[in-house]
Regions:
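Conserved catalytic alpha/beta core of Sir2/sirtuin-type deacylases, generalized to analogous enzyme cores
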Residues: 1-3, 104
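Charged, alpha-helix-enriched surfaces in structured cytosolic catalytic cores
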Residues: 4, 46, 50, 66, ...
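N-terminal first-folded block
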Residues: 4-39
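Structural motif
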Residues: 16, 35-36, 61-63, 79-82
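Short, ordered loop/turn segments at secondary-structure junctions
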Residues: 23, 42, 67-70, 87
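N-terminal positively charged helical leader segments and presequences
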Residues: 30, 34-52, 59-61
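Mid-chain, well-packed structural core segment of small domains
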Residues: 52-79
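C-terminal structural segments of small proteins and small subunits
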Residues: 70-104
Length: 104
């Protein structure tokens, strides 16, 4: 399932529905555009703390299941933090993560 999520991240990048880099992801959170944030599990404790607080405040899921190298390889750029901006990609990723969507 991890590989499928990484492929979805690459597809979202090519579709222009993913942003990467600390400042841009924080901006997406503040503008309430980010649906889910991926942070490399090898990030510094300060970076992890910053994104935990931001994601908690803006009520966005933070996922740290990948290394920054895995995230970078999936999108073709050297990045440690990514945010999905599209609800469709978010739902597909949640399915892969085992999340059950209850709608209604």
């Amino acid at each position: 399932m991890k590989q499928k999520i990484l492929k979805l991240l690459g597809l979202a990048t090519r579709a222009g529905l993913l942003v990467s880099g600390e400042d841009i992801v924080i901006d997406a959170l503040q503008r309430k555009k980010a649906k889910i944030v991926f942070l490399g599990n090898d990030a510094s404790s300060n970076t992890l703390d910053k994104f935990q607080k931001k994601c908690f405040f803006y009520k966005v899921e933070l996922n740290t299941m990948f290394t920054s190298e895995e995230l970078s390889n999936s999108i073709g750029r050297n990045r440690m933090v990514l945010a999905i901006l599209d609800e469709g990609f978010h739902k597909s990723i949640k399915k892969c993560l085992g999340g059950v969507e209850n709608e209604g």
